C-alpha cells in the first residue's frame, strides 16, 4: 500500500504528526500522503522566540542583519530530506505557522511533489493599522502627524520595529507613494502616532503596514533537490522570501499563488520566488503574485571571487553582500564549464573545466582544480558557472502591486510568455546581470512575448516595461546576446542596452516619456 493519511500518525502536536508521517515515507520511496483538510498549527519554542525577538527589536532595527546568516538557529516545519518520489496531497490544508521558521524544506531529495498546500501565519510578520486622523505640522518641511488604529490581531508594543513601511490605498487598490517616518509614539497596544516626512496629502482611511523583517528563511526551500513539483500551493505570508531554490535541478511550479490573505494586502516580506545556481528546466506556469516586498522571480547564478590561486588550482568564494539566498555554500560541480569574467564589463574572456572540486562547508569556500592554469593577476575578474543556470519558462503568470521589479532574468535562456504585470514599483521585466550583488550572468537568448505591462515603473525609473541592461562599471559593454520583445501592450516603454542583437516588433507602447530606446551599437534584426 503506497498511500497513507496523516490521521494515522500520532504526535504531541501537528508538527510532530507531520514529522512521524514524513519519517515513515522517508524509508519507503514512492509513498503518497493524504492530509485531511483543515488548519494545522506548526510551531516550536524557538520559532516563537525568534518572532518575538525580531518584532520587539532585540535583533536590532533590521533583523536581517542577525537572521540572514549561515549560523543563525532556526527550526523547520515539514522536512523532506532524504525522500524519494514522495507526494503530499493537501487540498484544503493550511499550515498556520506560529513564529518565524522555515515551514517547508524540500532538500537533499528527489521526485518530491506537493499539491494544494497553503502557508500562513498566526501572527503575521508585519503589522496592519488604519490611519484615522491627519494633521499637517509644517507645510515647508512637508511633515504631518497621523493617528493609527491597530486591530486586535495586530497588537503593537513600545519597542516594535519597522525596517520598511507603506500605505495601501483602498480606492486605487495598490500601495501608496513613498514617505518617511520621523518618529513613533506608542499610546497603547492598538494606537500610535507617527510623524511623517515627504507627506503632501492626507492618508486618512488608508492602511498602514509595518514590516518586521527583510530576508530570513523562506516559506519553502528547494535545495539539492531534483525533479521537484509544486501544484496549487499558496503562500500568504513569510518573514522572508516565498520560495528559494538553491542548487536544485528541474523544478515545475504550476498555479502557485503568493498573495495576501483575505483582508490584507502584503504577502511575503521580500521576493515571492528566488532561484540561484539551479539546473535543468525551471518552469512556472499559471502563477499569481501580489503584495510581496520584492521581485516576483529572480533567476541567477553567482559570480565567484578568486581568493587564492596557483596554476590550475584556485580557491573560490561568493562575496555577495548578504551571502547566498539559502545561506548555504554554493560551489561548482566536477565537469562544469567556468567562465573568467571581466568585472568591469561582465564579458566572458576565457573558459575552463572543473576537474575537481572540494567544498569546505565550514569555511564557506571551495577548492577547485581546473583543466588549465588561470592568469596570474585576477583582481579584475570574477569566475562564473553558466552550467548552474536553468532554462527558464515563466508563462501564463500574473503579478500586481508589489515592490521592486517583477521578473528579473540573469540566465542564459528564458521565455516570458502570456504574462500580465501591473502596478509594480519598478520595471515589469529586467534582463540584467548585477555586479554589485555578484549575481549573473549575461543572457544568450531571451524572449518576451504576448505580455501586457500596465502602470509599472511607478518610482522614478528609466523604464517601466522591459529593461535590458548590465549593471556594471562599463556602461558600453555588449554582454547580452539576443533579446526578442513582442508584446501587444507594454506601457511605459522598452529600453535595450548592453546587448549584441535585439528583435523588437509588434509592440503597442504607451509611455509617459520615451516609448522605445535602443542604444547605439545594438544590432536590430
Task: Give the positions of each predicted feature.
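Right-handed parallel beta-helix/beta-solenoid
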Residues: 1-18
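Extracellular parallel beta-helix/beta-solenoid repeat domains
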Residues: 14-15, 19-36, 40-525
